[in-house]
């Protein structure tokens, strides 16, 4: 065999090995798993007092690239004012900016007690996610860690597009 033929064979084998290594890495690389339990008092400057009678608990769980987000609304007496549960997948994790991009594909809503006023935040989140799900089949949601204290296991997190800041 000629020298050129050996070089061609070596290059083909090397490229094949590199391709196999890349394939193994992509199949074995696991997405980040995380869990956040967050809370926030609701306040809307435009509405004033009407929305300050509620608080919000947000639970976010991500495992193996799938995500579940539960928004639970309560009045100050602890009565449920409604829940919005969303499920989807984690599209991207930006570790430098501490940001998670989630594509929500399903949503379920439960209204609180009969006759109880729903928080403005509930109404907005229900409306905007409904539009996106009906139009595109998915609702994009981002979660960004604004501040973090690992010693106290605490973080301040921003949820978009609902523009909600929570302590987690």
PLM ranges: what are they?
Residues 31-53:
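Tryptophan-anchored aromatic micro-motifs
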Residues 17, 35, 163-165:
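Mature extracytoplasmic/luminal segments of secretory-pathway proteins
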Residues 20-23, 52, 139:
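Charged, amphipathic alpha-helical segments
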Residues 48-99:
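Extracytoplasmic/periplasmic/luminal assembly and interaction segments
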Residues 94-168:
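Non-cytosolic head/periplasmic domains of membrane-anchored proteins
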Residues 31-39, 64-69, 151-157:
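Short, hydrophobic/aromatic-rich segments at coil-to-beta transitions
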Residues 39-45, 70-74, 103-109:
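Generic short beta-strand segments
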Residues 3-26:
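Hydrophobic membrane-insertion alpha-helices, especially the h-region
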């Amino acid at each position: 065999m000629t020298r050129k033929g050996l070089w061609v064979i070596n290059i083909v084998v090397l490229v094949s090995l590199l391709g196999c290594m890349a394939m193994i890495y992509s199949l074995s690389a696991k997405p980040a798993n995380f869990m956040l339990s967050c809370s926030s008092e609701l306040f809307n400057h435009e509405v004033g007092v009407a929305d300050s009678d509620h608080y919000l608990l947000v639970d976010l769980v991500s495992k193996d690239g799938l995500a579940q987000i539960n928004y639970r609304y309560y009045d100050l007496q602890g009565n449920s004012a409604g829940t919005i549960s969303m499920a989807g997948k984690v599209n991207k994790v930006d570790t430098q900016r501490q940001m998670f991009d989630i594509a929500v594909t399903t949503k379920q809503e439960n209204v609180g007690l009969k006759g109880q006023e729903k928080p403005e935040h509930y109404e907005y989140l229900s409306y905007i996610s409904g539009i996106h799900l009906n139009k595109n089949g998915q609702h994009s949601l981002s979660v960004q860690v604004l501040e973090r204290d690992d010693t106290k296991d605490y973080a301040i997190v921003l949820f978009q597009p609902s523009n909600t800041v929570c302590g987690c």
